[in-house]
Curated annotation (Swiss-Prot):
Species, as recorded: Mus musculus
GO molecular function terms listed in the Swiss-Prot or TrEMBL record: chitin binding
Annotated spans, 21 X 7 AA tandem repeats of S-K-[TAI]-[TI]-[TAP]-[GED]-[IVM]: 486-632
SUPFAM superfamilies, alphabetized: (Trans)glycosidases (SSF51445), Chitinase insertion domain (SSF54556), Methyl-accepting chemotaxis protein (MCP) signaling domain (SSF58104)
Protein encoded by which gene: Ovgp1
Protein name according to UniProt: Oviduct-specific glycoprotein
């Protein structure tokens, strides 16, 4: 009762907004009419005033052209769907192409060449105008996954850029409003980094529908909610985490539309007495009477289930669940939708996306709360608000994390949160005509150090989005080594004093060191093979490095007449730094100490001028030292060859032959640049040339592409990281 009173107060406060125009984007599926009895929904059953944008799912593709899935869609559903705009002139309708069952092969074929994309774009403009749609929604699940090659990530971006250009040109020529362009994208971090360039998508698309649901389901071994608003730290499976992740990658917040599911997912419990959150399950529970899909209930089926079940609230996730016997259900209701809508407004996101409008209680016959109870609350909070300076309520976002909410089982919590396997499945129970609906691929999870807590905050995190890195595995390692730097710095300074006492002994053994140079170079292959082992002892090595640089000054005072050997020593230093570069592939911490060693070389060369006057008497040792010079020369030559090879490989990895090079970003970093902690970035910026004005060769490459400028930027990083 207390929660209901609190919610009532919050809703009254939310009636006053900051004047921002929020989108309420609602999907309608072309199979909704095929459900039995009162669950059968046609377009004329929809309320045209509830949503700001209606999206018809789904169209298909044939011979690289957009087509209707069947004649009924084209002749009956399309006209009836767009006729809703006669009742609401402000309503926008879009046609979505793709979906889970559509797969990826037809997308890949269409994206592969400029000619295929142009054919698709021409068909899209004609098809949308003929049937009265206001835009296109791309529902490609997912570029670079499920059989889609990695370069589809970039070809997908090229298609979006070319669609936007064509839509603008068509609007200019016909004086019609420009067609809208949106896309449905994943809310799972590892899929995001594999499939999308978040920054560029945010610039090209009118809005982005984030699939912030299907985060838990009966494919897992433990119960979990389908779409929690928040999650525990180190857990990326929540709507807030997904939205903030896209925003951190550079997507404008006002273009991000958060997903709201009008369905729940159920589990069959292992033990009836263990019925809380994160308890063991044996798979999906019984299918719904109308949707007929195991592990899945539409909201109108949820209402029937909870009327005879025990209901609970997950405090830190702001969502409900219910259980009856061995059946456990995580779902959304009007209260959880209200909290999520308030979160959207508080974070200034673009609005809410509903999957789907036809799974709400359309006629109000199942739940007893009137037609469209879920979507109606979103309409009240996001659309029917008036401008006012009243601030949004803050207190509910600052509650502490309660890991032991009603019925939770903490014993199972750790195992679930530490899993590194993500199941990819159809969003929102899309597949309605087949018995097998779940598909999955194993993905490596991203470290969730930026997880969103009920406080609505996120810990700082940096992201490096480059064309070369399509997976998050490398980035995860880079983040770990950054932490490693800061931990070893203090230890280095503590050992300096002890090493300075051995200066005199070091100066007497200089000749012996030069003779052993050849032996050191011979052991380089062995060192590189043992890299994994070396990384475990790196902490000890890094602590002595700074001390060595400080003892050089003492050596210069006692080393009379060693000017002839100085050159030989400087050559061996280059060889050592090369060894370090190999090791830095496994432990970046070692590469940081290399800078300290290279600085000692400069110090020695500076003392050479002063000592050259006392060369007499040391010349007897010169022949022995000169014998090592050829070996040093070989090392220097090898380094130069490797640097050239690395640069060549970097260039090749950026632009695979299958990619259309309408635009790309090129980054290179040679070993010598790594030694000086410098990174060179070259950005090729495209001139404003229409894709239609580019003549394409058979492999899809444009040969009339012009570039406005070649910009070279050099960033210098301090040696302390």
């Amino acid at each position: 009762m207390g929660r209901l009173l609190l919610l009532a107060g919050l809703v009254l406060l939310m009636k006053h907004s900051d004047g921002t125009a929020y989108k309420l984007v609602c999907y309608f599926t072309n199979w909704a009419h095929s459900r039995p009895g009162p669950a059968s929904i046609m377009p004329h059953d929809l309320d045209p005033f509830l949503c700001t944008h209606l999206i018809f799912a789904f169209a298909s593709m044939s011979n690289n052209q957009i087509v209707a899935k069947n004649l009924q869609d084209e002749n009956v559903l399309y006209p009836e769907f767009n006729k809703l705009k006669e009742r609401n002139r402000e309503l926008k309708t879009l046609l979505s192409i793709g979906g889970w069952n559509f797969g990826t092969s037809r997308f890949t074929a269409m994206l592969s060449t400029l000619a295929n994309r142009e054919k698709f774009i021409d068909s899209v403009i004609s098809f949308l105008r003929i049937h009265g749609f206001d835009g296109l929604d791309l529902f490609f699940l997912y570029p670079g996954l499920r059989g889609s090659p990695p370069h589809d990530r970039w070809n997908f971006l090229f298609l979006i850029e070319e669609l936007q250009f064509a839509f603008e040109r068509e609007a200019l020529l016909t004086q019609h409003p420009r067609l809208l362009l949106s896309a449905a994208v994943s809310g799972i971090p590892s899929i995001i980094h594999t499939s999308y360039d978040a920054l560029l998508l945010g610039r090209r698309l009118d809005f982005i529908n984030v699939l912030s649901y299907d985060l838990h389901g009966s494919w897992e071994k433990f119960t979990g909610h389908n779409s929690p608003l928040f999650s525990l730290p180190e857990d990326s499976k929540s709507s807030a985490y997904a939205m903030n992740y896209w925003r951190k990658l550079g997507t404008p917040a006002d273009k991000l539309i958060m997903g709201f599911p009008t369905y729940g997912r159920n589990f069959y419990l292992l033990k009836e007495s263990k019925n809380g959150l994160q308890t063991a399950s044996m798979g999906p529970a019984s299918p719904g009477k109308y949707t007929k899909q195991a592990g899945f209930l539409a909201y109108y089926e949820v209402c029937s289930f909870v009327q005879r079940a025990k209901k609970h609230w997950i405090d830190y996730q702001y969502v409900p669940y219910a259980f009856k016997g061995k059946e456990w259900l995580g779902y959304d209701d009007t209260i959880s939708f209200s909290y999520k809508a308030m979160y959207v407004k508080r974070e200034h996101f673009g609005g809410a996306m509903v999957w789907t409008l036809d799974m709400d209680d359309v006629r109000g016959t199942f739940c007893g709360n009137g037609p469209f109870p879920l979507v109606h609350i979103l309409n009240e909070l996001l659309v029917q608000t008036e401008s006012n300076s009243t601030p949004l309520p803050q207190f509910w976002f600052t509650s502490s994390v309660n890991a032991s909410g009603p019925g939770s089982e903490n014993t199972a919590l750790t195992e679930v949160l530490t899993t590194d396997t993500i199941k990819i499945l159809p969003p929102g129970g899309e597949a309605m005509t087949t018995e097998v609906h779940r598909r999955y691929e194993n993905m490596t999870t991203v470290p969730s150090d930026g997880s969103v807590t009920p406080g609505g905050t996120a810990s700082p995190r940096k992201h490096a989005v480059t064309p070369e890195n399509n997976t998050m595995a490398a980035e995860a390692k880079t983040m770990s080594t950054l932490d490693f730097f800061s931990k070893t710095t203090t230890g280095v300074s503590k050992t300096t004093t002890g090493i300075s006492k051995t200066t005199t002994g070091v100066s007497k053994t200089t000749t012996g060191v030069s003779k052993a140079t050849a032996g050191i170079s011979k052991t380089i292959p062995e060192i590189s093979k043992a890299t994994a082992g070396v990384s475990k002892t790196t902490t000890g090595v890094s602590k002595t490095t700074t001390g060595i640089s400080k003892t050089i000054t003492g050596v210069s005072k006692t080393t009379t007449g060693i000017s002839k050997t100085t050159t030989g020593i400087s050559k061996t230093t280059t060889g050592v730094s090369k060894i370090t570069t190999g090791v830095s592939k496994t432990t970046t911490g070692i590469s940081k100490t290399t800078t300290g060693i290279s600085q000692t070389t400069t110090g020695i060369s500076k003392t050479t001028t002063d000592i050259s006057k006392t060369t007499t008497g040391i010349s007897k040792t010169t022949p022995g030292i000169s014998k090592t010079t050829p070996g040093m020369t070989v090392i220097v030559q090898t380094q130069a060859n490797e640097a050239e090879t690395t640069a060549t490989m970097d260039h090749q990895s950026v632009t695979p032959t299958e990619m259309d090079t309408t635009l790309f970003y090129l980054k290179t970093m040679t070993p010598s640049e790594k030694e000086t902690s410098r990174k060179k970035t070259m950005v090729l910026e495209k001139a404003t040339v229409s894709p239609r004005e580019m003549s394409a060769t058979p492999n899809g490459q444009s040969k009339t592409l012009k570039w406005a400028s070649l910009i070279t930027e050099v960033e210098t990083y301090s040696q302390d990281g």
